[in-house]
Amino acid sequence: MTIFDNYEVWFVIGSQHLYGPETLRQVTQHAEHVVNALNTEAKLPCKLVLKPLGTTPDEITAICRDANYDDRCAGLVVWLHTFSPAKMWINGLTMLNKPLLQFHTQFNAALPWDSIDMDFMNLNQTAHGGREFSFIGARMRQQHAVVTGHWQDKQAHERIGSWMRQAVSKQDTRHLKVCRFGDNMREVAVTDGDKVAAQIKFGFSVNTWAVGDLVQVVNSISDGDVNALVDEYESCYTMTPATQIHGEKRQNVLEAARIELGMKRFLEQGGFHAFTTTFEDLHGLKQLPGLAVQRLMQQGYGFAGEGDWKTAALLRIMKVMSTGLQGGTSFMEDYTYHFEKGNDLVLGSHMLEVCPSIAAEEKPILDVQHLGIGGKDDPARLIFNTQTGPAIVASLIDLGDRYRLLVNCIDTVKTPHSLPKLPVANALWKAQPDLPTASEAWILAGGAHHTVFSHALNLNDMRQFAEMHDIEITVIDNDTRLPAFKDALRWNEVYYGFRR
């Protein structure tokens, strides 16, 4: 059972009565065949549901209205099998508030050269029916995705599946509640922002809860539940001597388990799926939540440190998008550099909170070590290196008049040396196109020091996310050149300025 089982995508066929009942019967027959095949063979993340043909303005309006009010409907896939006059779609598309994808396909793959006649031409009109539909989308300035390809083509399947992930994620985001335990880290700018504007733009709400309220729940957790969770730790992780039974830091592990259970209970009771903490606001907690946060992220919760609610929300969104895909997704921070001619590297980490979904090791190390910040007991944490391969880091920032999503494509590499004194999980990567260009572009665009790191998602996923939410995206990859990047920032300033 995944979040995608809670949603469905409606498959809508556009046509008209001009062609007569026999043509419409064939259109319906083709649509049923295509939907059944896609549900069976395309490995789509959620189910396609065929709706009745849209052949009149009233029918189309009813479909769009029903989609808006059906909580299970994540979006619409529209196929213009025949020509469908686009004025029929205006009222429905005007009210539609769900994501829309135009599937530019046709039932047959090859033309029947010897038998093709006007009946065939009238039945299979995607080539120009799709253009009529696309005009009204452009005329109405309505954002929608387009996938072209035969319905049996695997690349088309992948692109539809990727869009479905975005559509489901958008619906989940509309219900997302972010809990901030304490406030923003004092005097920090980029982690702050306009929470009202964020709720208007994305749909997620952000509210603060006193740490004392959390502490009350943590203290209510029974010793039996704590011991059961620690037994789970014993089976999942490599325990250091200090954390084992009779070890000098065993009590810290027990306390970390109590915090995890308390946090999870608090989040479940409040319906929260993302949260933040800050080391400056830990009153009543015996240690900074480290292990608890890591394990909650692995269960799908969004998180960011120092009150950074934008990154916490973005992590949850990307966790939903990547559900079931290979590779993990985590809170991350560009921490320090390795400058070496031709081999510049970035070491990413955080004080404690890196998600084990990106771990290279099957059983990360569970340890308790000193943390010289926060003024509390030594916290428990999982220590591991990260899987290698292509990845992205993404940052969502508030520019006042708009949101900007920054994405840097990176290549994670194996740590060339052991890190015996580094008591935290880490990731090591090469930034594309190179560290000087990537860091300068990131800084020029105002990118945050907190990011979401993902092996599971790619640049195309984040482009779709930005388009679906109608926000700016700036990309740093192997094609980036600083003069052109600076020009793009200037052009975006003008473009979004005109849209205010």
UniProtKB/Swiss-Prot annotation:
Pathway: Carbohydrate degradation; L-arabinose degradation via L-ribulose; D-xylulose 5-phosphate from L-arabinose (bacterial route): step 1/3. Its cofactor is Mn(2+). The keyword Ligase does not apply. It is an enzyme of class 5 (isomerase). InterPro entries: Ara_Isoase_C, AraA_central, AraA_N, AraA_N_sf, Fuc/Ara_isomerase_C, Fucose_isomerase_N/cen_sf, Lara_isomerase. Binds 1 Mn(2+) ion per subunit. GO terms for biological process: L-arabinose catabolic process to xylulose 5-phosphate. It catalyses: beta-L-arabinopyranose = L-ribulose. Mn(2+) binds at E306, E333, H350, H450. Its EC number is 5.3.1.4. GO terms for molecular function: L-arabinose isomerase activity; manganese ion binding. Gene3D superfamilies: 3.40.50.10940. One of its GO terms (cellular component) is cytosol. Keywords: Arabinose catabolism, Carbohydrate metabolism, Isomerase, Manganese, Metal-binding. Homohexamer. Belongs to the arabinose isomerase family. Catalyzes the conversion of L-arabinose to L-ribulose. NCBIfam families: PRK02929.1. This is L-arabinose isomerase. It comes from Shigella dysenteriae serotype 1 (strain Sd197).
